[in-house]
C-alpha cells in the first residue's frame, strides 16, 4: 500500500508464507512527513519450536540520523540475541551494541558502546562468558 496526502506519505508492504510447519512474515513500512523519514522492517520466521526475528528502524530527520535493530534466534538449545542503536547528529555520534548467546549450559555476553562529540571521544566494551566450565571476563574503557 502506498498512500499520499498533503501532510505525509505512507508505505506498507506485508508478506506471509506458510510451508508445512514453517511460517514466515515480513512487514515493511515507512512514513515521510515534515519531521523526516522513518523506515521500519519486521521479519519473523517460526516453526513449532523455533523462532527467528529481526526488527529494524531508520529515522532521518532535522536532528540527524538514527537507527536501531534487534535480532533474535531461538533454535533449541541455542539462543542468540543482538541489539544495535546508533545516532548521528550535529552534536556528535553514538553507538551501542549488545549481544548475548546461550547453548545449553554455555553462555556469553558482549557489549560495546561509543560516543564522539566535539569535546569527547569514548569507547567501552565488556565481555563475560561461561564456556566449558571456565569463567572469563574482559572490560575495556577508553576516553579522551
UniProtKB/Swiss-Prot annotation:
Biological role stated in the UniProt entry: Apolipoprotein B is a major protein constituent of chylomicrons (apo B-48), LDL (apo B-100) and VLDL (apo B-100). Apo B-100 functions as a recognition signal for the cellular binding and internalization of LDL particles by the apoB/E receptor.
Entry GO CC: cytoplasm; lipid droplet; low-density lipoprotein particle; mature chylomicron; very-low-density lipoprotein particle
GO biological process, one term: cholesterol metabolic process
Quaternary structure annotation from Swiss-Prot or TrEMBL: Interacts with PCSK9. Interacts with MTTP. Interacts with AUP1. Interacts with CIDEB.
Record-given protein name: Apolipoprotein B
Subcellular compartments: Cytoplasm; Secreted; Lipid droplet
Record key words, sorted: Cholesterol metabolism, Chylomicron, Cytoplasm, Heparin-binding, LDL, Lipid droplet, Lipid metabolism, Lipid transport, Secreted, Steroid metabolism, Sterol metabolism, Transport, VLDL
Record-annotated membrane-spanning stretches: none
Organism: Oryctolagus cuniculus (Rabbit)
Annotated tissue distribution: Detected in liver (at protein level). Highly expressed in liver. Detected at lower levels in jejunum, duodenum and kidney.
GO MF annotations, alphabetized: cholesterol transfer activity; heparin binding; low-density lipoprotein particle receptor binding
Amino acid at each position: 500500500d502506498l498512500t499520499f496526502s498533503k501532510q505525509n506519505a505512507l508505505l506498507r508492504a506485508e508478506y506471509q508464507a506458510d510451508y508445512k510447519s514453517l511460517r514466515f512474515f515480513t512487514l515493511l513500512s515507512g512514513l515521510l512527513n515534515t519531521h523526516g523519514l522513518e523506515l521500519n522492517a519486521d521479519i519473523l520466521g517460526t516453526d513449532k519450536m523455533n523462532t527467528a526475528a529481526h526488527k529494524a528502524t531508520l529515522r532521518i530527520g532535522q536532528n540527524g540520523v538514527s537507527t536501531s535493530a534487534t535480532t533474535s534466534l531461538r533454535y533449541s538449545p541455542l539462543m542468540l540475541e543482538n541489539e544495535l542503536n546508533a545516532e548521528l547528529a550535529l552534536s556528535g555520534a553514538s553507538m551501542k551494541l549488545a549481544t548475548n548467546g546461550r547453548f545449553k549450559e554455555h553462555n556469553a555476553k558482549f557489549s560495546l558502546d561509543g560516543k564522539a562529540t566535539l569535546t569527547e571521544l569514548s569507547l567501552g566494551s565488556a565481555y563475560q562468558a561461561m564456556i566449558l566450565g571456565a569463567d572469563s571476563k574482559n572490560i575495556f574503557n577508553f576516553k579522551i
